Amino acid sequence: MFLLPLPAAARVAVRQLSVRRFWGPGPDAANMTKGLVLGIYSKEKEDDAPQFTSAGENFDKLVSGKLREILNISGPPLKAGKTRTFYGLHEDFSSVVVVGLGKKGAGVDDQENWHEGKENIRAAVAAGCRQIQDLEIPSVEVDPCGDAQAAAEGAVLGLYEYDELKQKKKVVVSAKLHGSGDQEAWQRGVLFASGQNLARHLMETPANEMTPTRFAEVIEKNLKSASSKTDVHIRPKSWIEEQEMGSFLSVAKGSEEPPVFLEIHYKGSPDASDPPLVFVGKGITFDSGGISIKASANMDLMRADMGGAATICSTIVSAAKLDLPINLVGLAPLCENMPSGKANKPGDVVRAKNGKTIQVDNTDAEGRLILADALCYAHTFNPKVIINAATLTGAMDIALGSGATGVFTNSSWLWNKLFEASIETGDRVWRMPLFEHYTKQIVDCQLADVNNIGKYRSAGACTAAAFLKEFVTHPKWAHLDIAGVMTNKDEVPYLRKGMAGRPTRTLIEFLLRFSQDSA
């Protein structure tokens, strides 16, 4: 048996223990079909011994205390999110990964605005499951670590990687709960994480594959398989024209790919007449910037400029799987923003569905143009709430980075509900201003009722939100600018590098709580 990492001083002890058959000769000699992830807490006092979780204690007893013995000689106590792997301790598990959970009993951190204990579990379990995946073991049992939902989220989110177009793929690892714990909470965590992974998949897929039409087809397939209480309408260009969505059409006309207006319904309420919550998502499947073309550096990331549509549609798919007793509508205007002889030109004036005219001074501020018409249409459902999500502005990335989604809302009630949900999920939100100060900058327009960019360079996220507000009359509306959380580099430890699918879990949690409050 050998252990990584292992201090030189411990190698002698390991060999001595090995002679006494405290564990087997190595992973090759064991059954390489299943691994185990177990948690351990940090020491509360300097003289204390680190404490295993209940599952960890039970396993240690099962192997006659060998796990703690080899853990003690293998190095210093594990810090939060760190792992240590052992082999051959038990015939059922070829590898056992012990993961650091941080402080036992950690709760809500009012400065961080999240539940520290849940975040520690997600990060630790993700790290442990990846160790199992790196060993090419196809199955892992996961310690619930005191919160089976958070553990499931860590496992499912942490194992996901988009490698569908590669010849060499990572081993697919099946994660399940270790022991007879809270299976309901585990399955709920799997569902939450799978919803976020669906959004990650949609955002990561190259734009030549994930066209507006293909996006709509993927959502239709997922929603229909989630519940029989669903309807999907894939609206063609002719329907968009009938709806007089001139602002949306002005963006779409620059591309050879036909636009689609995706409309999805989940009818979970026992009262069919119960007004729905309406979600609207920006669906630019590739954003070149149009005539106001972007710099080539990192333009490939603009395959994910439909992140708003991806998150709201994935949220509704997840709500359908949860069988929530509420009615939902999802609206996603889908198109590409491309330069061509037919494309919008700076200085053009277009007319939105509500009759307002828009001066298009920057064709790279196109997301707000397609959202304007979708928000107007959202009001026709007499909704309880309207929430839109969009990778709308680089200014939001500058303001908050990947720390939180920026929320602009005209309702403190709605803000509080979103904020409370985000504390639970760890996918944070932060309230931004909707001052009249910003509205003045976009309605002071030479040629039209409103300009698609502000008068000044400053506060671009705020002027974009002020623009959207011109197409909203509902008293409970929130605009989520998710540009800063679109990708993950290394900021969220339980997400691999790539498209993040945020804040899907926060929106699912918001709906779960809303349905419980309405019951």
Swiss-Prot record:
Protein's GO biological process: proteolysis
Catalytic activity: Release of an N-terminal amino acid, Xaa-|-Yaa-, in which Xaa is preferably Leu, but may be other amino acids including Pro although not Arg or Lys, and Yaa may be Pro. Amino acid amides and methyl esters are also readily hydrolyzed, but rates on arylamides are exceedingly low; an S-substituted L-cysteinylglycine + H2O = an S-substituted L-cysteine + glycine; L-cysteinylglycine + H2O = L-cysteine + glycine; S-benzyl-L-cysteinylglycine + H2O = S-benzyl-L-cysteine + glycine
InterPro entries tied to this protein: Leucine_aapep/pepB, Macro_dom-like, Peptidase_M17_C, Peptidase_M17_leu_NH2_pept, Peptidase_M17_N
Positions bound to Mg(2+): 287, 364, 366
Binding, Zn(2+) 3: 202-203, 205, 303
Residues annotated with N6-succinyllysine modification: 45, 61, 103, 221, 455, 476, 489
Enzyme class of the recorded protein, top EC level: hydrolase
Residue positions of the active site: 294, 368
Primary location recorded for the protein, binned into one broad class: cytoplasm
UniProt GO molecular function: carboxypeptidase activity; manganese ion binding; metalloaminopeptidase activity; peptidase activity
Record PTM N6-acetyllysine, positions in chain: 221, 455, 489
Residues modified as Phosphoserine: 42, 54, 180, 194, 238
Binding site residues for Zn(2+) 2: 282, 287, 305, 366
Binding positions (Zn(2+) 1): 287, 364, 366
Cofactor note: Binds two metal ions per subunit. Two metal binding sites with different affinities are located in the enzyme active site and can be occupied in vitro by different metals: site 1 is occupied by Zn(2+), Mn(2+), Mg(2+) or Co(2+), while the tight binding site 2 can be occupied by only Zn(2+) or Co(2+). One Zn(2+) ion is tightly bound to site 2 and essential for enzyme activity in vivo, while site 1 can be occupied by different metals to give different enzymatic activities. Mn(2+) is required for Cys-Gly hydrolysis activity.
Enzyme nomenclature, EC number: 3.4.11.1, 3.4.13.23, 3.4.11.5
Localization of this protein: Cytoplasm
Residues noted as binding substrate in the record, renumbered to the chain: 282, 287, 292, 294, 305, 364
SUBUNIT field: Homohexamer.
Cited PANTHER family: CYTOSOL AMINOPEPTIDASE, LEUCINE AMINOPEPTIDASE-RELATED
Family: Belongs to the peptidase M17 family.
Function: Cytosolic metallopeptidase that catalyzes the removal of unsubstituted N-terminal hydrophobic amino acids from various peptides. The presence of Zn(2+) ions is essential for the peptidase activity, and the association with other cofactors can modulate the substrate spectificity of the enzyme. For instance, in the presence of Mn(2+), it displays a specific Cys-Gly hydrolyzing activity of Cys-Gly-S-conjugates. Involved in the metabolism of glutathione and in the degradation of glutathione S-conjugates, which may play a role in the control of the cell redox status.
Protein name: Cytosol aminopeptidase
Organism: Sus scrofa
